[in-house]
Amino acid sequence: MKKIIILLTTFFLLSGCTIPRAVFKSSLINQDDPRYNLVEVTPTLKLSAPDTVPKTIVDPVFAANNWHWTSLAKGDVLHITILSSGGAGYLSNNASGDRADFENILVTDSNTVQVPYAGTIPVSGLDVTQLADEIKKRLSRVVLNPQVIVTLTARTGAMVTVEGSGKTGRYPLEQSMNRLSHLLATAVAVENTSTDMMEVHVTRQQHYFTARLSDIYQYPGLDIALQPDDRITLRQVTEYVNVLGAAGVQGKHALVQRHSSVVDALALAKGLNDNLADPQAIFLYKHNEAEQAKQQMRKLNIYHVDMSQPNSVFLAQAIRVDNGDVIYISNASLTDFAKVKAAFDSFLTRGTNSF
């Protein structure tokens, strides 16, 4: 009789207690709440689709291809050979008969070269063949039938700089590497990088160009021609989605692609917790929309996804998740009952063992 009295007393004590919930219930969400609009995700819901074409506007400075990879640039080092049937030995100490050689001719910062008896020659926009023709024309006044050969011995002038997340360093511009995609193929370790989450910045004097690596590979208009002294900065883009509540793994999860969906985010969180989650009560809070709602003084939209429906996966795949968004998974109704039962069983066991 005494045992029965204790058990009944324990039951009535528990009936007056409430078990704290880790998350709120779906029943607490009100369609008419003055603070937000509850938007049901259904096949008829029309949301703005993610941009499939990048909005990057290429500055005309980058669109113009006014420098060719064969053009000489400041810092280049040349070897000039002059041949003449009338003798060229007097042109240089490094001469033999009808041949004179000039080594280590440097293209100066003013884009000129200094050639004995030919004077100072501007080389902007010239390649080695055009420079040889100009030297030949100038020497024809002092040398009989001159023949000029210009060789590029060190390509130290036409260089671009790579910094940031890639293989940093200085890279020469040449025939096989004169566009942005050529350089990125060398400077980026793609096997360890999501091209969708890599941002490329190009600085040219006071002008700037920015695009995602995947867009540069996909859209030819973004594959700009490089010029000497361009500075390329590679930056890994890190974006997160917060998955809270009855998820497999709660917390902040890094997105692995730009246009992620609710399904992608749930996969990062190891799905729903089978023992706790209510698949009918998944809510999406969009960070950008929250900021817009505050600025426009309107109610915030909260999107409700019912993953218990057969077509729910397709609907969830159509809902885009962006950086800073929050996905909340509610507890199932039976979860509270399970907590009460566990607590009651614990008291029951203690009461029985005390006798």
From Swiss-Prot:
Entry similarity comment: Belongs to the BexD/CtrA/VexA family.
GO biological process: monoatomic ion transport
Alphabetized UniProt keyword annotations: Capsule biogenesis/degradation, Cell outer membrane, Ion transport, Lipoprotein, Membrane, Palmitate, Polysaccharide transport, Porin, Signal, Sugar transport, Transmembrane, Transport
Purpose: May form an ATP-driven capsule polysaccharide export apparatus, in association with the VexB, VexC and VexD proteins. May function as a membrane anchor for the polysaccharide. Possible porin properties.
Positions of disulphide bridges: none
InterPro entries assigned: Poly_export, Poly_export_N
Pfam families reported in the protein's UniProt record: Poly_export (PF02563)
Keyword Transcription regulation on entry: no
Protein name as annotated: Vi polysaccharide export protein VexA/TviF
Residues covalently joined to lipid (S-diacylglycerol cysteine): C17
Species this chain originates from: Salmonella typhi
N-palmitoyl cysteine: lipidated positions: C17
Main localization (coarse): membrane
NCBIfam families listed in its UniProt record: PRK15175.1
GO CC annotations, alphabetized: cell outer membrane; pore complex
Localization: Cell outer membrane
